[in-house]
């Protein structure tokens, strides 16, 4: 108690020295008031009272009766203090009991301190001061690192861990550490699957109250946080802060492993798992593992087939709202993300980020089999299937398999004959938006992909990639039949026809066939009777 008082004096909270402290300084035995167990529940309320006086029991009961032991000078067998609180500002104590108790105690024994807003019994003098601070809002404890102030020393100690990086609270299940016990408790729900906070509107459950609060805004449709730069609105201030970095280009979160920077701390955390190779989130249905819980949630929809988000324009449905938002830009033609280097615009910020690597020449993801590097992890995953021969996406119509889901989607249009993407310049239609984009370059003559080594330019990035192999001598596509290698997969496919005997072109008017692509045009003219 004496030490607490000295600390309070040091930070400038206590102005005068109580008689009790004088008694302690002189080495005299202080009086002792025992705290008895809580009895039945008459009305008592002040949440602060419960926390300060009986911390453990106070959490369980808001309404309590306080029984203090009999004092020698007091005539009654037990002295009761009944407390009635209607609100924080109105906390009344029976005046006779208050005065009676003070008369029964000596000056040094006085345990009742009068608060500015209400009267309260404290088991420590320091608690009286701490309680007063809560009402005044005084913040006497300042962080030397960032100047942030706190009203409690314990709060400052907790805050300091942000700067020191100390994380004393560790999860026994996975070893992840936290700087607060509350964060560890929340984290444990990932392992237990406990989601105590449920939305009354749609039944969706969450493991954090803050997540439920944020979720509820979806049902109201409110977006109070608006970007001054582009007018886009958000339902969370944090989302607006993150969005603003698109305009500023700020990326404060940097990976120590590869130097890559991110605009969000969560994206950096997810990225780090790539280096660690860790995939803690496993699908119970098929056993597939993921590095992020959100990716697992998205994956599960494959098994359920649920698609909640429908496009009003064309009726196409999506499993994620973000996918629908991106899809709508096909109809609107909106491309809000523009490259400052070459002026090219994109529908998605992630596509712009990937595009920028073309200019920077960045390729973080390397194939362990052939050492080929890629600017996107997804491209590396797809590339690996060349070596494994894996083709997980199969057409139900004809049985043809593909190593990309997008290839299967494109292939299916062959059966339907649908060509939704039309060129405004010449009227030619295509079954893919990417094919239309490539086609448009014919009219503009634009060649944005230039090789610095020889200065040659191309209208497609894939053509530039193939061209680079001429200089490097790289030939990653090898024929399993004869061992011959090529720098282009399409050339390998044509080469394979030599072994199978398949012909590339056979005119309807004659029985001759051609297996050389260079001779096809000549054959066509001969069959047509041209000279």
Curated annotation (Swiss-Prot):
UniProt family annotation: Belongs to the krueppel C2H2-type zinc-finger protein family.
Q: Which residues form the KRAB domain?
A: 1-43
Instruction: From the Swiss-Prot or TrEMBL record, give the protein name.
Output: Zinc finger protein 492
Report the locations given in the UniProt record.
Nucleus
Q: What is its main location?
A: nucleus
Cellular component (GO) terms are: nucleus
- Biological processes, Gene Ontology terms: regulation of DNA-templated transcription
Its biological function? May be involved in transcriptional regulation.
Keywords for this entry? DNA-binding, Metal-binding, Nucleus, Repeat, Transcription, Transcription regulation, Zinc, Zinc-finger
Zinc finger map (C2H2-type): 141-163, 169-191, 197-219, 225-247, 253-275, 281-303, 309-331, 337-359, 365-387, 393-415, 421-443, 449-471, 477-499
One GO MF term attached to the UniProt entry: zinc ion binding
Task: Read off the PANTHER family from this record.
Answer: C2H2-TYPE DOMAIN-CONTAINING PROTEIN (PTHR23234:SF8), ZNF44 PROTEIN (PTHR23234)
Q: Organism's domain of life?
A: Eukaryota
């Amino acid at each position: 108690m004496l030490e607490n008082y000295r600390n309070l004096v040091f930070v400038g909270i206590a102005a005068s020295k109580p008689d009790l402290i004088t008694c302690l300084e002189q080495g005299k035995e202080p009086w002792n008031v025992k705290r008895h167990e809580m009895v039945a529940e008459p009305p008592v309320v002040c949440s602060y009272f419960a926390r300060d006086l009986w911390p453990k029991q106070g959490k369980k009961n808001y309404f309590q009766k306080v029984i203090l032991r009999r004092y020698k000078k007091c005539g009654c067998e037990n002295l009761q203090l009944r407390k009635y609180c209607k609100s924080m500002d109105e906390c009344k104590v029976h005046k006779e009991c208050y005065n009676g108790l003070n008369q029964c105690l000596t000056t040094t024994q006085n345990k009742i301190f009068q608060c500015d807003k209400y009267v309260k019994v404290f088991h420590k003098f320091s608690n009286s001061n701490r309680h007063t601070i809560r009402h005044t809002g005084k913040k006497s404890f300042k962080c030397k690192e960032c100047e942030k102030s706190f009203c409690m020393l314990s709060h400052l100690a907790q805050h300091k861990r942000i700067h020191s990086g100390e994380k004393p609270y560790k999860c026994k299940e996975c070893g992840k550490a936290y700087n607060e016990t509350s964060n560890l408790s929340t984290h444990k729900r990932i392992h237990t699957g406990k989601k105590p906070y449920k939305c009354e509107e749609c039944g969706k459950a969450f493991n954090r109250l803050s997540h439920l609060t944020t979720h509820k805004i979806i049902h109201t449709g409110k977006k109070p946080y608006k970007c001054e730069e582009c007018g886009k609105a958000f339902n969370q201030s944090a989302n607006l802060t993150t969005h603003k970095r698109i305009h500023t280009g700020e990326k404060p979160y940097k990976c120590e492993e590869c130097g890559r920077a991110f605009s969000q701390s969560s994206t950096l955390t997810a990225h780090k798992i790539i280096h660690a190779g860790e995939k803690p989130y496993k699908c119970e249905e098929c056993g597939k593992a993921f590095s992020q819980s959100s990716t697992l949630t998205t994956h599960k929809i494959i098994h359920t087939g649920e698609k909640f988000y429908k496009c009003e324009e064309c009726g196409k449905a999506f499993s994620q709202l973000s996918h629908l938002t991106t899809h709508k830009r096909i109809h609107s033609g909106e491309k809000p993300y523009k490259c400052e280097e070459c002026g090219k615009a994109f529908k998605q910020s992630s596509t712009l980020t990937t595009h920028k690597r073309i200019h920077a020449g960045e390729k973080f993801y390397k194939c362990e089999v052939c050492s080929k590097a890629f600017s996107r992890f997804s491209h590396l995953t797809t590339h690996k299937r060349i070596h494994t021969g894996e083709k997980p996406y199969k057409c139900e119509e004809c049985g043809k398999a593909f190593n990309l889901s997008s290839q299967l989607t494109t292939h299916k249009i062959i059966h339907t004959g649908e060509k939704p993407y039309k060129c405004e310049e010449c009227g030619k239609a295509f079954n893919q938006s990417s094919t239309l984009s490539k086609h448009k370059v014919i009219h503009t003559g634009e060649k944005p992909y230039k090789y610095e080594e020889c200065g040659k330019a191309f209208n497609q990035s894939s053509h530039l990639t193939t061209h680079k192999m001429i200089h490097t001598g790289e030939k990653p596509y090898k024929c399993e039949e004869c061992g011959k290698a090529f720098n282009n997969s399409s050339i390998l496919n044509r080469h394979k026809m030599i072994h199978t005997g398949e012909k590339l072109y056979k005119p309807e008017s004659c029985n001759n066939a051609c297996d050389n692509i260079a001779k096809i045009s000549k054959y066509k003219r001969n069959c047509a009777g041209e000279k």
